[in-house]
Structure formats: C-alpha cells, structure tokens
C-alpha cells in the first residue's frame, strides 16, 4: 500500500538540502492587539430621521503606521480606518466611524530591506478580520445595519503610499519620468 502512494520522487527538502539554509526562517508572532482609539458618531440620532428614502453611500479610508519598539525585534503597527456614510440623494451625513487599531508584533528573519513592506502589508492583513468585526459591531450598535468592510488590498495601499512619498520628495519643477 505504501508503494502505491510513493512515486519515487524525493521530497523537495531532500533534493536541495542547503538551499534554505542561507535564508533564516521568518518568525512572526502577534504579541497583542488592541483598540487605540475608537469613535462613532450617529448623525441621524442627532438630527432626527431624514425625510424621504435613504440610500446610504459609504466611503472607507485607510492609513497605516509602523514603528520599532524598544524591545528587540518588536514593532507596533497601527491601522487607521475612517468609515463615513452619507445619504446618496442629499449628501446628508448618516454616521462616522473612526478606529485606530494597533498590534505589537515580534518579527525575526525578515531582511532589513523587506521589513518595512512586511510590517505595512502582512501585519495589517493579519489584524483586518478583527477590525472588520469591530466596525460591523459598531455600526450595528449605533443603530444601523452591520457594515462588513470589503477586504483591503494592503499591497496596493503600500504602493500608493510609496508613490505619494516619492512625489512629495520631487521638486515641483522636475518633470515626471
């Protein structure tokens, strides 16, 4: 029976035993996650129910920040979400939800030139399901249907931020290439 499942090919580790030895294994551990700042404003409750039909229009803005902590191999990553809903017909505000969600990560084995993208892409990606649940619960608890955010493309967000920083460093009279 064991001969039927064995095709005779060696396992990838056995074929190239020294290939992975030069590159250390990446070690990532979430030490803690927490709400750093949280705000929910229900404009409907403050102004009263809008007249006519309400067609909600929702915008989501995301920004990220990462910094080294005093402890070795520890980094703090902050994801900032601003979720704003307004009535599509008259642009009147419905709610505003702001959440700064943080995580402290222990990261080892990531090459220095890849550490910043790793912190700004992989760490927020790991925290996102928790952010999504908090925003969903907040909108529901605020008197609205739960808002389940679509997944965020953190790679595209990182590339946009790098492009923005590059553009900001370029002198105004220098042409774009």
Curated annotation (Swiss-Prot):
| Keyword Coiled coil carried by entry | no
Q: Where does the UniProt annotation locate this protein?
A: Cytoplasm
Skewed-composition ranges (Low complexity): 8-22
| Residues in coiled coil | none
Where does the record place the region Disordered? 1-22
Does the keyword section mention Chaperone?
yes
BP GO annotations: protein folding; protein tetramerization; protein transport
Q: What is its main location?
A: cytoplasm
Report the protein's function: One of the proteins required for the normal export of preproteins out of the cell cytoplasm. It is a molecular chaperone that binds to a subset of precursor proteins, maintaining them in a translocation-competent state. It also specifically binds to its receptor SecA.
Protein name listed in UniProt: Protein-export protein SecB
This protein's species is: Paracoccus denitrificans (strain Pd 1222)
Q: Coding gene?
A: secB
């Amino acid at each position: 029976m064991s001969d039927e499942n064995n095709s005779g090919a060696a396992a990838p580790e056995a074929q190239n035993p020294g290939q992975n030895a030069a590159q250390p294994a990446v070690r990532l551990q979430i030490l803690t996650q927490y709400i750093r700042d949280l705000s929910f404003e229900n404009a409907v409750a403050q102004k009263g129910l809008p007249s006519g039909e309400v067609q909600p229009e929702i915008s989501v803005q995301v920004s990220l920040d990462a910094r080294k902590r005093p402890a070795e191999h520890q980094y703090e990553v902050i994801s900032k979400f601003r979720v704003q809903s307004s009535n599509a017909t008259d642009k009147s505000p419905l709610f505003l939800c702001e959440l700064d969600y943080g995580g402290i990560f222990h990261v080892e084995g990531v090459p220095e030139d890849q550490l910043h993208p790793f912190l700004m892409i992989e760490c927020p990606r790991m925290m996102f399901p928790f952010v999504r649940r908090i925003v969903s619960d907040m909108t529901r608890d605020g008197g609205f249907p739960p808002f389940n955010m679509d997944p965020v493309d953190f790679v595209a967000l990182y590339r946009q931020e790098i492009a923005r920083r590059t553009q900001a460093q370029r002198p105004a009279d220098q042409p774009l290439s």
